[in-house]
Every structure is written in C-alpha cells, then in structure tokens.
C-alpha cells in the first residue's frame, strides 16, 4: 500500500497512519464531567456510543478522525521520558524507518505514552488507533517474519494460515497496534506484476479460503476484537492483480462478469464470513473510474449487496492520485468531495486531502453529515477494538512473545509446509547424508535471509546456507560460492526499499561462476539457490522504485551459472527463492531436482534443510501457474474453452500447472463417487474419494476438487477449484476425503447477472493437481420448471437476538413455534416486526406479516421470521415421513431469503431465494433439494433482503407435507 512519493526515499509505511483527534493537541484539558458520558458506557451499543461522541466533537475533531498522519522522525518523548504533544503530528520516532533500531517493546512504551496523554490530558479522551503492516508477520524490527503470502498459499492449509495470522496479530497488538493493512486478496493473473508475492495466487476460491483464515486469525471469532487481536484490512479493492501490461496501478479494465467471478470472490468471503473490519480501495481504475470514487464498487457491491459495515480506507496517497495521476479531480478539495461522497472514510498518509473538508463544510460545499458518517465509522472501529476501555499494552508481554520460541517454531512449520517439489528425477531427493562427503551450496540467494517484501529485520534469521550447515554438522563438508550476483542492491529486506536498482555487471560474474564450477566439480552434490531477491520483485511505487518485469526468465547470469554447474556432471538440485513464477526452461529440462520455496521467511534455511535431507516430506502445491514465457500470458488454469489455441512453433502448455506438487512418496486416488449422483437444482450432494499412501514415507497430499459445467447459458471455465483438503498419510494408510457440493458451489452468473443453478451435467474432478484428476458426472435436474434456481448469499451463522415471541401466530402448520429475529450481534443493525394480519392466500383468514429495515450492515443481515418445527432451534423435529416444504408469499417485490436449518448442517443452512411479488405466489421445495431427509429439521427462516433498506413481505400456509 505504499504511496506514490516524489522524494528520494519515501515508502508509504513511513507515514502509516494513525487516527488523530485534534483535541489531543489543539485544546487545553477540561475538567472531568459530573456524569459519565454515554460514549464511556460499554453497556451501550456501539451505535449509541458513536452518536453520543459525535455530538460532543467539533468539526475539526471529526475531520481529524478521518485523516492520517505524517512521520518526520521527530521525537515524541522529552528527556524525562514523558510524551510531547507538540511533536505528536510527527508520529513515532523511527517506528517505520529503515534505519530504525526501535524494538517492539520500545514501540509499546511509546504508544502507551501517546494513549496515556490522550486519555488523561484531552477533553474527550479519544484513543489513538495505531495502524501497521502485517503482510506475513508484524512489520517491525525483531518481529517474527513468516513465509511470504505466496508461500503461505502453497501450503493449501487454511488452518495453518489462521495460526500464522493469529501470531502476527498478537505481536502487533502487544506493541500497541490496533489495525493492520492485510490480507492482500488480489487475484494474481499476471506474474509480471511485482506484487504477485503478496497474493494467494491466481484462484479465487483458494484466495477466499486463505483470506478468511487470515482475517479470522487477525480479528478472532467474535465481533468485538480483544487485546490479542487486531482489525484486519482487506485490500486492494478491487481488480488490482491483473493490471494492463503487468505494471503496478495500471487499469484493470474487465467486464462485470469477470470481476464478479474472479476478483471480488475473496473480498466477498472476507466481508460475509470473516466480518473484516476495514477495506482498502485500490489505486487502479475500472472502466475509466478509479476505485477510490467508484460508487458501483464501494457502495452498491460492498455496502449494499454484501452488507459491509466497517470503514473504507484509501490506499497511501490514493486520493492525491485522483488529481495527479487519474486527472478526474481538478484539485485536492474536489478529490475530497468525490471520495467522501463515494464512501471512502479515511485519507491514509498525511491526510492533506480530507483536511480540505473543514473549510468545504463551512462553505456548504460538503454536508457535515458525510463527515459524521465517515468519522463515526472510524470511532466504531475504536469501540470494536475496546480502545476506550483499555488502550494500553504490556511491554513485558510484547518482549515475551515477539519472535519468541512458539512463533519461531510456527514459522519453521509454515516454511516446511510451503515448499513445493517440482521435479525429482531418479529420486535424487531427499539427499542421503551417509553417501555425501562434500556438499556445494552455490548461488546468489544461498547466504542471505530472504523474507520478501513488507518486512523488517526479523528477530531471528536462518539462511539456506546456515540451515544446511546446521543440519549437516560434521557429517559432511559444506562449501559455498556465491556463483553470481543478481543486483547491486542490498540483500534481504533492505533490498525491497532500495531505489534505482541496477543489475550486477555481467563481466564481474564470470570469475564468480568459474569459482562455483570448481567447487561443484569436487562435490558429491551441488545445491543451487537461485531466483529473485527483494529488489527485483516488489511493489513499484515510483520511477525510481520499480518492481514489475517484462520477462520471467532468471535474471542476470543465473542461467549461465546453472548451466555451468550442470555441465560438471555433479548431481544438482535447484532451490528457488522468488516472489513470482519464473520461466525456468533450462532448469526444468536439465536439472534433475527442483524445489520451489518462494520467500520462506526468517526460518527458511531450517525448513529448506529439513526438506533437502528428508526430515520433512514436501507437500506444498503451486497456487499459481508457471508459464514457459511471458508470451504465454495470461496462462491461468481456469480459462475459457475458446482459449485453446497454441502458438506457431511453440507450446502454451505450462511448465508447471496450478495445484502441482510432488512428494517423496506416492499417492493413489481411487473410488471417486457422488452420493447422490443426481440432484435437483438447489440440492446438495457429497463427493468422496479414497487416497492411499502407496509409498514408503509418511507424507502430505492435497485433494483438489474441481468442477466444470458442460453446457450453460454463459460460457464457463474449463475447470474451477471448488474445494481442497490437505491430508497426512503414513505408508499404506488410506483415507476417504469428503466434499459437500452445495447450490452455491454449482451456481453461476446467468445472462441477467443473477446467481443461479442451471440444470445440466457437471463434471466433478478430484486429484493431486489441476492437470491430473479423476472425473465423475453429476446430473442436475430442473426444479419447478425454472430455467435457473436462484442462489442466495452464503450463510454466516445464526447469531441473532430474539425480539418478540409470537407462539400463538396462526398458520397452516399446527406444531412448533414462531419467533421474529434480528441481527443484534454481528455488528449490523436490523429491525423486524411480525404480526398476524387478515387476508391470507387463497382466501384464508389471516397471514403473517414481516416488515423491517437493515440500517447498518456488517456481514450477514439476519432479519425476519423463524419457524421452529420442534419448538426451538435446539429441539429438532423428526419429519422424515414428510417430503416437501411449501409456503405462499407476497410482498414489495424484493428478493427475500428462505433458509432451512438442520442439526446435521449446523451453522451452514441451505439457502434459497424467493421474490416477494405483489401477488401471492406458492413456493415448494423438496427435502431432497434442500439436502435433508427431514429427520433433524431445526428451523425454517424467512428473511428480508441482504442489502440495506426497508422491506415487507407476507407468509401464509406454511406446510411440511
């Protein structure tokens, strides 16, 4: 997210912001009020507390809430160690400076001083929301640096990813940071783009699962974020991962269908499932409209359709770019008006754009209500984090956990799981140390710790060379040669910051290669550590600081080095350290064993040695395709059928396909079956496959589930990932892996851009990679003569508050109970009433009327009527002698939602949509289509629309028959 600076050294994290309340330093302290103000009462709702606090704030204070700060490296503390408010706008000394020696403990002490001053010396005592980076670990000196995001994606292990971000969030919060700008949920479909390393790869489903894991790891499971968690920020919204030409911030001009089916998927999951607290707009434009002023994107989709209730932040200098880059605003004041009206709540970086709002409100150019709305969302974030109750942290705890033993071991575990075995001819790997006398470790990436972008000096670091030496000990001789240089920039994380990077002098590499050849020739095995470094693939934020490439070949003299070593005849292993897939054609053809490590983080050397010598069996899978050359781009696996042509005199078959990864053992996939193999639209089936470890080593395999619809009203990808599970198996062990295929899984956007399930034949494919699967067919038949069965938004849980009880409501069903529910837990705000009214369907005497309003969204808006056949959600009814559920409905024309809860499905009910038309209409759903046999029916729910606004509908003659 760094800003586009004009100075020689100015990456944006230097101005990572902090929320300001201007009264902290512009007004004298006031006497304590006689009564505790409402905003100080934790028993009140967040909305009530925000409203009270806003009523007490000046315009200047409210604008300060939505503006970032600037770091000029001035001290906040005087000689006595006390906080100096006169320097507050300079932020924190060195906390984000590349030359800083500030430790997390020192940062915690400084932030405590800031919070104490604000709490004790300012009239309103509004706490500071400190923000930071945690792309793959809290970005601070001494913190734990976990594997880069692309490496984490290679684990195909969301549970592990959640643990990583739980640790990262705890380290950040312990240092006083309340919000981090992660996860990156961009879909990387052009590896020329330097920020590919920051992503979870090219697939929307994989990115969504990893993204939700990251969000819940950072924030925890509860809406209120405790003092071991931080608020997450989903970025960059949206269409940032496939820029024109692969250059950072370039346009993302794709159709709404492509955007919804690919780029928006992980963001929707982060909002609806993870309840992410913040979303960051992206630099790029979509169809001529920059994301920062894109009403369709930020309002219609994010807030109205998905019910997002958090706050939207700009990217660093994103608002300035409206004037200086996109030229859609004549000046900063106009940029502020446009962005605020669109729904951007926070001006990241120095806040200079939104500070123009003070005068604009006074002049009548901007309604103060728009400032209130944005400031209120920032204040709500502080309340959600509990900062008004306790803004302080314990520096001793900070010191204890930061890069402590538990987090270091987790970093090793994550790095081990991330390694992908790409090739292993004649089982060269794992290396048998008993047969080796001399091991040559060669390459420009061997001796340094490469952690990837958005990192600082980790608390501990192990290079691959050091890891091998530690593992080998005295069992063999380990010799080292650099082989060649890639660039003249500093190695490791400092290279990510370097400006005006130059490739190393080719002539100077000749003697280095010669020296490496001499070592390789005398060794029993050569381990070549090549690829990229942090200065060659990274975020490009200025002409002096680039990171995108027009070639994916190994840079500099690395291919010459590899060729020279291979030609010695010494068995050779290539270990790749890089942040994007590379066109390693010579390596793939001539080197017998290849491992992909990406940037493995601070413990990468230990993990690499574990894999090389067989202590750990590699089980990672590629989250992105390896092309032969940039001429093959785009080459993502889930392309459309018409994209099937190759090029003259060459092939477009990837070097390594999405989902690919070998093992030191072998696995067999058998007995793929569907139960049932035929369902109605809206139905549910199970896919099961048996996996057996047929080799002699324990190892991990990933069962990857893909789908293709043979005939549809809109062209479909040749295949798309819909499920996966990583399993560990001992030699000879067999396990059955099961996947549930739901209407949401089978759904598509039809010609009217409605999400539906169309009847037809679906190919269900399972295997160890996208190019190696077994296939069965699923037949989906029509339901009620509909061309396509609508699919409602995915469920988020049943956290609801009982508002009223209408057990005596008269309906056709003569058992159970009715209750009205609203979302009162998950951060949204919904109201609903239910009553019996005269004039039902088919001349009946009465019906049930439900009306309500979704006035604030945060995840799932859960407002409507619940019917409990057994008398309550925890009292399921056995209705297995019944076949169907039917009801009559009418209303105001909005699309409402029908849910079926069963004890088996738990918090994952089956969803259907129904349109509450002005005239009565009957809907009938079979138990089979709802994925149940009726033996454990807990509840039926009739809910209003997912978006914000008022609704009204009527239900009558609900029958289970």
Q: What is each of the regions a protein language model found here?
A:
Residues 745-761, 931-937:
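Short glycine/proline/serine/threonine-rich loop/turn segments at secondary-structure transition edges
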Residues 789-961:
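Beta-rich carbohydrate-recognition modules and glycan-binding surfaces
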